[in-house]
Each structure stands twice: as C-alpha cells, then as structure tokens.
C-alpha cells in the first residue's frame, strides 16, 4: 500500500497502468474503492491514480474535518501531484469529487489537461439539498446494505466517517456556501460536465439549469445529461461515460 505525507497525516493512493496521469476523485462518504469497476477501462491507456482524501478510506483520520472541505481536498490532490512529480494531469471527479476537480482546475490551471465533473450539487450549497443530505444519511445508516457498503469503503469506523462528513457538509453550507473561490470565467482547460436526468439526489431539472449556468460563463465547458440512471451517472451509465472520457483525454 502506498501513502504520502500531507501536513503530518498519511494519504493513501494507488496506481494502475501506464501513460498520461489520470486521477479519479471519490465523492463524499465514499472512498477510492468506488472506482474498482471502472478503473480497468481507463488503465488500458492511462496511468490511473486513485486516492482517499484525509478522513476517508485507508487515509489517516482527522479529529475534525475542515469546513471548506472540497477546496481543502483540492490541495491534497495537488500535493499528490507534487509528490509524484506530475506536471499535467487529467481529472475525473464524482459527486463531491467533481467539486474538488473543478477547484483544482480553477486554482492550478497550469497543472490540468482536462477535467470531467460528474453528478455534483452546484456552484454553491443549497440549504434544501444540504438538509436532504443530512436527513437521508441519518436514515441510510439504518439500511443494512448501505452500512455494508460503507464498511467496505472505510472499515469498522465507517459511521464516524459518515458523521464527520455530514458535519462538514452542514457547516460548509452554513458558514461558507460557495464551493469555489474563483468564477468559472477563469477556467483555462476543457471541462466536461455530466449527470443523469434521473439522479435521485437532486430536484428534477437540476443539471439542465446548473450546466447552462456554467457553460454560459466559459467556452471551455461542455455538458452531457444521461436520460436514465441513478447517482452517480458515471457508474450508472458506465460504458457511455467511459467512451466520452476517452474522447476527451486520448
């Protein structure tokens, strides 16, 4: 198992395949293990890297998670790139990981070849969606299948991980709000936005409004909304998603 040091804590990462570096970024309450089914499709031609953000998966735990969570996670991605000596990378972010990927592209434009941002909430936190997340996780912890999945992702302390994540999400919505420190007009690399029209996490029409908003701010953005499939779209529409990514990155 591979780790690198980040501000006194160990971050877990894995590498598969050869070629240009392509980093896959997991979402909230998940870990890099979520990408197990999709990695083989990308590792044929790319040097695929996955990582567990601090507090998640096989990375070190934190006594308290940062409030500006996704911005902080973007710094961890760049720290991994510095550690490995990656000058230019491709990024695929899923859900919360998509917010991280966009933050990296906005804050470190010289490090990015292209980005895919899949199934994410928006430009700023929504109070109604945040409350839905909080309530949904509370009840989900009573679901045996959900609990088993999280134990695979994080280990025996999965419930503490979920609670810490939820606390950070709620605190961010209350005290920070914005997911990004810079406007999309400052993007300097191609970004593909993807989501499913049937995503159960968000209201109907969520992605149409969000993607129109982003694409109106920058010529670097393109979008695709899958007609069917649950959250996240990259897993529920895997084959089509992979094909679109290969066209972007190859």
Task: Set out the residue ranges of the language-model regions.
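Flexible "cap/lid" loop of the alpha/beta hydrolase fold
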Residues: 99-107, 111-145
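Short beta-strand/loop motif that positions the catalytic acidic residue
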Residues: 187, 193-195, 199
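Catalytic active-site module of serine/aspartate enzymes centered on a nucleophile-bearing elbow/loop
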Residues: 221-250
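Conserved alpha/beta-hydrolase "nucleophile elbow" surrounding the catalytic nucleophile
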Residues: 28, 89, 93-95
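Short alpha-helix in the alpha/beta-hydrolase fold that links the catalytic acid
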Residues: 180, 189, 203-214
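Active-site nucleophile elbow and catalytic-triad environment of alpha/beta-hydrolase enzymes
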Residues: 167-183
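Active-site loop/oxyanion-hole signature of alpha/beta-hydrolase fold enzymes
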Residues: 50-90
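Conserved HGGG/HGGXW glycine-rich cap/lid loop of the alpha/beta-hydrolase fold
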Residues: 9-62
């Amino acid at each position: 198992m591979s780790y690198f040091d980040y501000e006194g804590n160990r971050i877990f990462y894995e590498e598969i395949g050869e070629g240009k570096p392509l980093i896959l970024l997991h979402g909230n309450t998940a870990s890099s293990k979520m990408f197990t089914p999709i990695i083989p499709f990308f590792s044929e031609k790319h040097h695929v890297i996955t990582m567990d953000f601090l507090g998640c998966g096989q990375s070190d735990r934190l006594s308290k998670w940062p409030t500006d969570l996704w911005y902080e996670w973007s710094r961890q991605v760049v720290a991994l790139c510095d550690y490995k000596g990656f000058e230019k990378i491709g990024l695929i972010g899923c859900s919360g990981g998509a917010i991280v990927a966009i933050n990296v592209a906005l804050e470190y434009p010289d490090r990015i070849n292209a980005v895919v941002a899949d199934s994410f909430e928006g430009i700023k936190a929504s109070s109604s969606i945040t409350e839905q997340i909080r309530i949904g996780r509370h009840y989900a912890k009573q679901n045996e299948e959900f609990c088993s999945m999280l134990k695979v992702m994080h280990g025996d302390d999965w419930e503490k991980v979920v609670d810490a994540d939820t606390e950070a999400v709620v605190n961010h919505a209350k005290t920070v709000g914005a997911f990004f420190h810079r406007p999309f007009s400052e993007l300097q690399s191609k970004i593909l936005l993807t989501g499913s029209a049937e995503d159960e996490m968000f209201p109907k029409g969520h992605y149409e409004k969000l993607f129109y908003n982003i694409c109106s701010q920058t010529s670097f953005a393109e979008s695709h909304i899958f007609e069917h499939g649950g959250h996240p779209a990259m897993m529920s529409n895997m084959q089509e998603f992979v094909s679109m990514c290969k066209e972007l990155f190859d």
